[in-house]
């Protein structure tokens, strides 16, 4: 029987043969539409012609490679188990063999060492979760234990809350761990269904909410006007640095993996939205295009967590208690995979609606248009309902120019225009209906109101402040908390290196590599296909530089340590852009 990788290799060979015979087309060559990366652009130079050959040879498959097994740990006295692990040396890529087997092993063992894992509880010890709760919480109608054992064998229930109340919007994600290396929400780490017997009603928009014990504040924000901030970019390089990288980038950390202040929570590159946005905009790198970016931010609530004595979710509590005291990366890595790298301490809830008009520079010059004209008409048309005559009076743009610009935006799918594409990214309040309208045209006042109403009841976390997960490990809940905390810190450093996409080989033609578990994939700019983005009809395009992985930190010397990286993954070619950011870092130690 063939393995999955062998099937992929056979498929890759078939595709190459098909390309050689001229039977492989890009989406749109004969009216075909790809599943998700459908483009609204009608640019003759990029879309109308079809590829007849592969410019680059498909890279050879790269097989996944794991390290050799670590030594077995000593037998853990509390778990009566010992552990060993491997780690990822090289991810699979280009249909290479996958690492589809376990990267850790656990086996039972015997030891004479005593286990002292219990933390003294002055209250009631919950039967299954092991949580310690105050005895005054017994028989109060709430599931304070998480396993209902505090409500068992009650002669009478003394309910504090006489009426049902709702949970705060987005409270599930706020209680979850978050992997800030991948921008994903993981398992629950805080119990925001625990109220410590309190019944504190909180009315927001005529809805009665019950405030969880862990939450210090959840403050609604007054819904303001839907105003777009418009920014003009004369080149793709400026647009990518100021817009795309911020919308899809991962968080950067100071020493200790702490975030400084509130930071914007970006869209995952691996998500449908992230792939779509990157593919649609990156196709215009190194073209004569100008970019008009519009952005509207709607804040509906501010959230803040208590600073101490938090009630942990019982699933997270039990997982941390089951960790071995002797460091084993495999076990601690699994904790980070399942519960994330950080937890949220503050957040701004709401939505972000942004769109980008991509304009053909030559066509604009022929028609005597500037980005100021486009900005005035696109922004003004939304603000006053699209009345072109009023835009003409208010902004000093001729009525004909505004009318022509708005018509070209509307008709960009039907004919070749100076408007090459309209790319939309919506966070918060999204629905299929709203998204389908957003992708078709510039936002109207009616659409924005509909979106704003949806954001109110389905907000996204658009900004956050977070602390590393190990900060939840305290002596209140865990014996040997300092040992476990140090182990989690060490695992976090190793985990960051293991999951970084810098470990992927470069994609061709400015494709964006992403690492998913032990496999690398390429997000291709629209107009490029293939496992490495190697299939295209465009020739000799400039290749932008990308960073290699950071080196290990140097030994601490004079209270300082350093690390380096190189702009060679790939290096800039044919006039491509250099890597942005520093090539070295220095920290106190």
Swiss-Prot record:
One of the GO BP terms on file: complement activation, classical pathway
Mode of membrane association: Multi-pass membrane protein
Disulfide-bond pairs as recorded: 64-99, 75-109, 78-115, 121-132, 126-145, 139-154, 161-199, 377-402, 502-549, 504-520, 507-522, 524-533, 556-589
Signal sequence extent: 1-31
Pfam families: EGF_C8A_B_C6, Ldl_recept_a, MACPF, TSP_1
PANTHER family (UniProt xref): COMPLEMENT COMPONENT C6 (PTHR45742), COMPLEMENT COMPONENT C8 BETA CHAIN (PTHR45742:SF5)
Name of this chain's protein: Complement component C8 beta chain
Lineage, broadest ranks: Eukaryota, Metazoa, Chordata, Craniata, Vertebrata
């Amino acid at each position: 029987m063939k393995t999955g990788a062998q099937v992929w290799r056979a498929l890759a060979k078939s595709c190459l043969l098909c390309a050689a015979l001229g039977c492989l087309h890009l989406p749109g060559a004969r009216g075909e539409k790809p599943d998700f990366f459908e483009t609204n652009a009608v640019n003759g130079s990029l879309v109308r012609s079809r590829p007849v050959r592969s410019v680059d040879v498909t890279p050879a498959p790269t097989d996944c490679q794991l390290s050799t097994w670590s030594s077995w740990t000593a037998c853990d006295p509390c778990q009566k188990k010992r552990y060993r692990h491997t780690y990822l040396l090289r991810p699979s890529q280009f249909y290479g063999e996958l690492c589809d087997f376990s990267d850790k092993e656990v086996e039972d063992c015997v030891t004479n060492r005593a286990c002292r894992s219990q933390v003294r509880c002055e209250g009631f010890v919950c039967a299954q979760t092991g949580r310690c709760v105050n005895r005054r919480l017994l028989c109060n109608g709430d599931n304070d234990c998480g396993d209902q054992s505090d409500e068992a064998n009650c002669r009478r229930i003394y309910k504090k809350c006489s009426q049902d109340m709702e949970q705060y919007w987005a409270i599930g994600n706020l209680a979850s761990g978050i992997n800030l290396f991948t921008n994903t929400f993981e398992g629950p780490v805080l119990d925001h269904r625990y109220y410590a017997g309190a019944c504190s009603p909180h009315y927001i928009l005529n809805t009665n909410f019950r405030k969880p014990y862990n939450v210090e504040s959840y403050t609604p924000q007054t819904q303001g006007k839907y105003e777009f901030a418009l920014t003009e970019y004369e080149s793709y390089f400026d647009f990518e640095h100021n817009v795309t990288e911020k919308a899809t980038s991962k968080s950067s950390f100071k020493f200790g993996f702490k975030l400084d202040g509130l930071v914007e929570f970006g869209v995952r590159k691996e998500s449908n939205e992230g792939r779509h946005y990157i593919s649609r905009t990156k196709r215009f790198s190194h073209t004569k295009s100008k970019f008009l970016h519009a952005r509207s931010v709607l804040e509906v609530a501010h959230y803040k967590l208590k600073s101490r004595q938090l009630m942990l979710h019982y699933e997270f509590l039990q997982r941390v208690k089951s960790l071995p005291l002797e460091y084993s990366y495999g076990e601690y890595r699994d904790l980070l995979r399942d519960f994330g790298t950080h937890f949220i301490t503050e957040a701004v809830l709401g939505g972000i609606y942004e769109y980008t008009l991509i304009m053909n520079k030559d066509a604009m010059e022929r028609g005597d248009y500037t980005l100021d004209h486009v900005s005035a008409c696109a922004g003004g048309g939304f603000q006053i309902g699209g009345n072109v005559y009023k835009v003409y009076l208010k902004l000093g743009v001729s009525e004909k120019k505004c009318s022509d610009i708005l018509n070209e935006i509307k008709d960009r799918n039907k004919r070749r225009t100076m408007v090459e594409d309209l790319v939309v990214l919506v966070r918060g309040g999204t629905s299929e209906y709203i998204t389908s309208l957003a992708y078709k045209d510039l936002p109207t006042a009616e659409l924005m109101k509909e979106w704003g109403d949806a954001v109110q009841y389905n907000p996204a976390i658009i900004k956050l402040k977070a602390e590393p997960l190990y900060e939840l490990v305290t002596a209140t809940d865990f014996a040997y908390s300092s040992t476990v905390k140090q182990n989690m810190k060490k695992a976090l450093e190793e985990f960051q290196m293991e999951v970084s996409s810098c470990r992927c080989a470069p994609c061709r033609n400015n494709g964006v590599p992403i690492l998913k578990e032990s496999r690398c994939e390429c997000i291709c700019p629209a107009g490029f296909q293939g496992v490495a983005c190697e299939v295209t009809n465009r020739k000799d395009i400039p290749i932008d530089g990308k960073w290699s992985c950071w080196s290990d930190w140097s030994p601490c010397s004079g209270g300082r340590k350093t690390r380096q990286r190189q702009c060679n993954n790939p290096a800039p070619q044919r006039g491509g852009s250099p890597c942005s950011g520093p090539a070295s870092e220095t920290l106190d130690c």
